[in-house]
Structures are given as C-alpha cells and as structure tokens.
C-alpha cells in the first residue's frame, strides 16, 4: 500500500453550533482530521459558500493542519444546530447549502485517482448534484486490494432514502452503521430484527461487501468480514462529555489500521480506544494525547 495516497472524507462541510460554541463539523473534516492524527494523508473534500462562515471553515481547516479541497459555490455555507440530549447529539440541519452543490471537477478526479480510501455518507447525497458527484468520485477510484470505499451511513432526520442507501452499498466495500441506524434499515432489506450478526452477514452477501462495522455505543462494537471473521470489542468505561465525532474517529482509526497493515482485531481495538477518548472531549476534533 502506498501510504502517500489520499484518504478522503467526502461530503458535507459545515459548522456544528454546539451548546459550548461553534465547532468545525461534517463528515469530511471529521474523518480527515482523525486520519491525519494517525499520521496518514487525510484530505477533506466538500464545498463552502463565499461568506464569512465559509472563510471560517477554510481558516479552521488550516488551523487543524488539514489538507482540503473546498469548492467555493454560490450557496451559503452549511450549518447544523446541535443540541446534546443525555450526552448524545441531536441535529437540526439547514437545507439548500453549499455542500448540496459539490461539482465533480478535474481536480476532484485527480484526488479520486490518487486515493486509497474514501469515506462518504447518505446525508451529503440528499441533493441530486452532490449525489452524482459522490458516485462519480467513487467510480473513478476503481477497485482492487487496498482500496477502501467506506459507506458510513450517517442517517440524519429525513435526509435519506432506500434508493440512496442501496446505491451507496453497491458502490462500497466497507459499510459502517450503528445500532440505531440498523433498526431503520432492517425493514428496507428484510434483515433479521435483533440479530446483528445475521443482519450484517446478509448485507455482506447482498452487496458483495468485504467488511461491515457495527457500533453499539456503550454495548460495544462488532466487525464482520466476508471470510467469516468476527471481532467484538467492549466499549471502555470513560467519563463521556459528548459523542460528537466519535463515530468518525472510530472509522478513520480502523481504516488507517488496515492501511498500516494491522489485522482486523488489532485495527478494531485501536478504533475502540480512540473513539472512547474522543467521547471524553468537547467537539468532534480534539487533539490526541501524545
């Protein structure tokens, strides 16, 4: 594996308006940040507006020493109002914003052709334009050993459909979902209610997936592979402050572990430890302990 290749967070660039203040948010920045903390080449790809919030995102990415490709478009920069209810984030997402209008440009094609991994979700595909761009990007990456096309489903409000989820599963070879989200897709794909392993293995068979990652909060997490391997890790006991960003830190750490040559269990263990640490911090992108 060429560790100089891009590991891409593709999707929504926005501000999380938390009770504690404004924090850089969205899948691309979160994922790319945690990739960079693993010492690999994370890059955030999205779109922002030509406005103060957009310029602020660019400044924040630079302050976090993140590589990025942020298109400037004629729409306002994305904002999400985040309220913490019992420590868990509840999202109120503004519509018709910059990241709904990401173009597939020649530079994006260059990034795709030089990427070994991408993480994308359903939220950034709520608009036809950005959905088309996500699809083009993943198709341009190609397939093969060491190429990770990660669909981190990220169900938010009403911004998803079976059509988007099914197409995304067919485009991906790694699927990340949590225990709340799997309940939502169970009737869509006639999964076995309450049986996580049967459900995840059915998804592997239906969509020719290599890996399914299932996180269950305090109840631990599972990794299921297409060769029958199962890994379970319990969730470390920590004094959680909030869980914003924990999921993306988990996914980024796991994928970086595989790219660095770790096995499934070792990569899973590292992902669990990092996600637990992120839960003890304010915001999605805390500085890692050295």
Give the location of each predicted region:
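Conserved phosphate-binding/catalytic region of the ribokinase-like
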Residues: 1-5, 193-290
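Glycine-rich phosphate/adenosyl-contacting loop at the front of the ribokinase-like
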Residues: 1-66, 80, 240
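Proline-centered loop/turn at the N-terminus of a beta-strand
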Residues: 6, 41, 148, 174, ...
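Residues that scaffold the ATP/ADP-binding catalytic core of kinase and kinase-like folds
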Residues: 17, 92, 185, 224, ...
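Short, conserved phosphate/pyrophosphate- and ester-handling motifs at nucleotide-, phospho-/glycolipid
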Residues: 35, 178, 247
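Conserved N-terminal subdomain of the carbohydrate kinase-like
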Residues: 41-122, 146
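Structural alpha-helical scaffold elements that stabilize or flank donor/cofactor-binding regions
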Residues: 110-111, 167-168, 205
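Conserved beta-alpha-beta core of the PfkB/ribokinase-like small-molecule kinase fold
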Residues: 117, 122-202, 219-221
């Amino acid at each position: 594996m060429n560790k100089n290749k891009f590991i891409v967070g593709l999707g929504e660039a926005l501000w999380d308006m938390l009770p504690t203040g404004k924090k850089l948010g969205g899948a691309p920045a979160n994922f790319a940040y945690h990739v960079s903390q693993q010492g690999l080449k994370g890059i955030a790809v999205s779109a922002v507006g030509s406005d103060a919030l957009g310029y602020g995102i660019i400044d924040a990415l630079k302050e976090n020493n993140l590589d990025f490709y942020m298109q400037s478009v004629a729409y306002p920069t994305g904002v999400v109002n985040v309220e913490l209810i019992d420590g868990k984030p509840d999202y109120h997402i503004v519509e018709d914003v910059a990241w709904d209008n990401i173009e597939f440009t020649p530079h994006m094609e260059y990034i795709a052709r030089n990427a070994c991994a991408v993480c994308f979700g359903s939220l950034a595909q709520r608009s036809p334009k950005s959905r088309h761009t996500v699809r083009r990007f993943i198709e341009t990456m190609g397939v093969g050993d060491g190429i990770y096309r990660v669909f981190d489903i990220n169900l938010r409000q009403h911004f998803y459909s079976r059509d988007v989820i099914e197409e995304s599963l067919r485009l991906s070879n790694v699927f990340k979902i949590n225990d709340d989200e799997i309940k939502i897709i169970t009737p869509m794909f006639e999964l076995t209610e309450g049986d996580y392993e049967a459900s995840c293995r059915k998804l592997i068979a239906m969509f020719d997936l290599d890996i399914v990652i299932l996180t269950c909060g305090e109840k631990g997490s599972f990794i299921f592979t297409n060769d029958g391997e199962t890994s379970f890790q319990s969730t470390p006991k920590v004094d959680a402050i909030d869980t914003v960003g924990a999921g993306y830190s988990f996914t980024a750490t796991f994928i970086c572990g595989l790219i660095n040559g770790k096995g499934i269990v070792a990569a899973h263990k590292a992902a669990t430890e990092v996600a637990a640490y992120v839960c003890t911090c304010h915001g999605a992108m805390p500085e890692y302990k050295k």
